């Protein structure tokens, strides 16, 4: 398939503003805070203090967590396990979720909390409310130095807490809750040690390990019963957020969908933190060398194109755009609009700038209530029909890549309406010459071009 794009100085402002706009828009499916490698944490910063007030005798530590929907499963699951192991009366966790508050606002009153853990969360008036709570004695810990500078301690200046949060995983999040209890001198609670969790790799639900690269993965996968050497290979590229938040059941659905369609999947997870370039070279070749096509819910960020550009050129396969929305599946299916306007930039525009094609909504965030804690959280839920459709499209692209150029059939469509400003010629495009150049290039690549342009 051929696509002609054109532009000029009138579009230059869009390219300059796009990186800024992407940072300001909500970003479904990924997180700005990333997992840190397992290493000895640095000593605490001199400005890193502890709790401002002592816990009331006989009362639990009251913790408010300010967050977004994608992080709620691990926070709730870990709290459930904490209560199971330590009982009630040690810690109370109250989640303030950006998307949930937007639908059902509640007064921003935080003075009753002993500690506020400020993660990524944007609620109007939140900063002022947190600052007021700090003046009343609440201990505010923020994962970013871009917010709450006047009242918060930076999480990374508290290595005993950061070691748990930055590495994620259910065990580490339980450990974070335990370490908070230690900070408030809760009797009977001793924090477990943090355990390293991979922040990049290849996942399969039937494997006992996360693979570092495709070479080791395919060596394992090809030894499985029923492996078809001639089946198409489909790469699935995702952010690491869901893996770090223990939502691997969603990964399993993605993998099984490809396997049920008769293809061989390889799912790789990874993430580039906003404003950083940590992590070295792009993992695309390491994960997906030899695949026929890639399905990706990555590339929401403009800086990712620069990071992956060389690897994409070397990989030289179609990359289909998978979209995860921060809305419930039923809400999306009942909407006449489909994709909300504030999702277009990071879900459609930015991925297309990176070369992704065929955007398809494949998942939403489903509100669920934990029966043990009574807390609401948001699971990533696959939209089955749409995902099956995208898998079929991916396999069609794989088949096309395996078809000789002379046997492919291509239609070139162009818009040309009346004369004047509406006409393509008024945009200073020489349509005839462009088509001739395209057809000549196709012929040079082995396509069978018949006839001539009149």
PLM features: what roles do these ranges have?
Residues 20, 32-454:
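An N-terminal assembly and electron-transfer interface module characteristic of large anaerobic redox
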Residues 7-8, 29, 49-50:
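Residue-identity detector for glycine
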Residues 1-12:
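N-terminal secretory signal peptides that target proteins for export/translocation
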